[in-house]
A protein has these predicted regions:
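Fungal secretory targeting signals
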Residues: 1-21, 187, 191-193
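Extracellular low-complexity, O-glycosylation-prone Ser/Thr/Pro/Gly-rich "stalks"
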Residues: 25-47, 55-64, 69-193
């Protein structure tokens, strides 16, 4: 007979195993800093080097925002947000420029000057690609209520019927070449695959 604590541990392990990883691919030529913020938890500043990568296990049960800044200080008006939520084994995700866009321009938004993208390797998922210098309100939040303020549907993407056991790739300066790493000093392989 299982005890309540054994069942609780098994349920927790199943929840953790059900989610993939949130991966930041920084294709920019400069470092960025990220903060992972969820309900009741927030990380300190995490440096992601130029042409580098950061990964963390995805959280389920509450929305998570990965806030991106060009400095090690998180200041309102100067950060981009990659956001995701896993609810009832369904992943939802979006990009928000609400804290940095000025009108139709995302030029003040970290990582956006070179384009931003968000996707999963799972083909059932939608994908976001907001190219550099483009106004892309159907791909990212420029205002907090696009239906009311712009007459556009919410730019939230999902993976219909695919569950949540997958990675979610968030790319800064997405117009640049994908990240590569050397294998045995002889060949380059795609870090983002």
């Amino acid at each position: 007979m299982f005890s309540k604590s054994t069942l609780l541990v098994a349920a927790l392990q199943a929840t953790l195993a059900a989610a993939g990883n949130a991966i930041i691919n920084n294709r920019c030529s400069t470092d960025i800093w990220v903060w992972s913020v969820g309900q009741g938890s927030s990380s300190s500043a995490i440096r992601v080097p130029a042409r580098g990568q950061y990964s963390e296990p995805m959280r389920s049960g509450s929305p998570t925002a990965i806030k991106v800044s060009n400095t090690d200080q998180l200041q309102n008006g100067k950060h981009t947000q990659f956001e995701y939520s896993i609810v009832n084994n369904q992943m939802w995700f979006d990009i928000s420029f609400v804290n940095c866009a000025v009108g139709e321009s995302s030029a003040n938004c970290p990582g956006a000057a070179g384009g931003l993208a968000m996707s999963s390797p799972n083909s059932a998922c939608g994908s976001i690609n907001c190219q550099s210098g483009k106004y892309c309100p159907s791909q990212a939040y420029f205002v907090d209520q696009p239906m009311i303020k712009l007459g556009l549907k919410e730019p939230v993407f999902t993976c219909p019927g695919a569950g949540a056991n997958m990675d979610l790739n968030m790319v800064t300066c997405s117009d640049s070449q994908p990240l590569k790493r050397s294998v045995a000093g002889r060949m380059l392989v795609d870090m983002e695959a």
